[in-house]
């Protein structure tokens, strides 16, 4: 191991001091050039971007590695070059050619070239871990990735897809964490057999991003140091992520000045720190939707009038105000806020009379009995109980069947439920990530290879599947957005999904802290613009 510089030693020392301070102790605020955040680090099992498939680890990758492009959060139809300076698409729509910025370097000091970019994408596919599935979305497989992802010269790389896709979709895939650029020379020096350096990278880092890894202590902390060779200026010299599982402990650390930000406060804790003036809170909608899935194998739930009636039998505003509060907001369409083509329409509210009229039209004027599989955890249990009471107003008797996440999900995936309450989270910020889940079912048979959400609810939708495929291939971003908006309008009126809420990330920061960018997915959380007064 190389000797640590004095700055890195200082960072580690500061982190250890912070960890040792009792929660009740009053102390000076964190150093002006250090940002300390209380968060949850229990998802970390590896540091390899080709293996990571969890939320907070994706955030780590987003700040230690670069990729070809990144989506513009202000306009999801646009992309900003990361290591790519410019790019073109061939006339047949299959090949994307990227020109790289000259003079880029990895944290190791090795130059970043097109060979590294091509090898990084090939590596992720050939490793065949969870993230490879994202790259498979544009047709890259173990059989073709070496031929389809090529270095043309030191500053030019090309990626060829298996069919014509919307350019926004391809760029979203190539701008996601599985396509992170890794240091080929460094990883090959640590390769064991044919593991592409995976064993070494599980606990080390080989990136070129704004911050480099100093130390990861599993279940405790991650310490990052500013990469002074980065192409953009960074105000924070050090970033320290602390694992603090209890929300109350996060609040005390924040109030005492031991951390600059807390990511996992409860609604009551958030209200408390704002009232005391010791913190400010920012809210960022997340690409996670909480919904009811209605299994159309149940003949009653298969009736369109029943599906619509249930949408009028949820007290969305009441549940939001009394159960989930500021951690979720009402959202009823399948594309989350911030996605290309999002339709922010919430036409449904609790209307028992309208629901009863629809049930009568469906031939069940007195209601019916049904089961709901519920994960025995907050907020699922509390929301399910509220929905149970709502449905009872129209004579619908709901039997709640509690279970852990593994049990309820297994039953859902086997299509053995009546109603399932759960969440869907997008892997990347492209509308296809959700359209494929809610509006695509090419084979409704039990032996289907495509078991997405529509399949799980036995919803046979050949026409909507064609529309999803057409939207995926639409080359013009504006027309693509229109296609998704039309699909959302159709599904609001006719679908076995009662989409209720969108998750909201609430971040509490100390006064004087600014610039923490929290996108709709963890892969789009950035420390680049962090500042402290």
Predicted region positions:
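Aromatic- and charge-enriched surface segment that lines or borders ligand/interaction sites
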Residues: 85-131, 152, 158-160, 250-253, ...
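Alpha-helical secondary-structure segments
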Residues: 36, 113-122, 154-160, 164, ...
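N-terminal lobe/hinge region of extracytoplasmic solute-binding protein
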Residues: 38-91, 122, 204-210
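Short, well-ordered beta-strand elements
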Residues: 31-41, 85, 95-97, 117-121, ...
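Detector for C-terminal structural segments
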Residues: 217, 313-342, 378-388, 409-533
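Ligand-site clamp/hinge motif
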Residues: 199, 226-272, 397-399
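Surface-exposed binding/hinge segments that line
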Residues: 99, 118, 136-189
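Gly/Pro-rich hinge or "lid" segments in bacterial periplasmic/extracellular proteins
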Residues: 73, 175-233, 352-353, 357
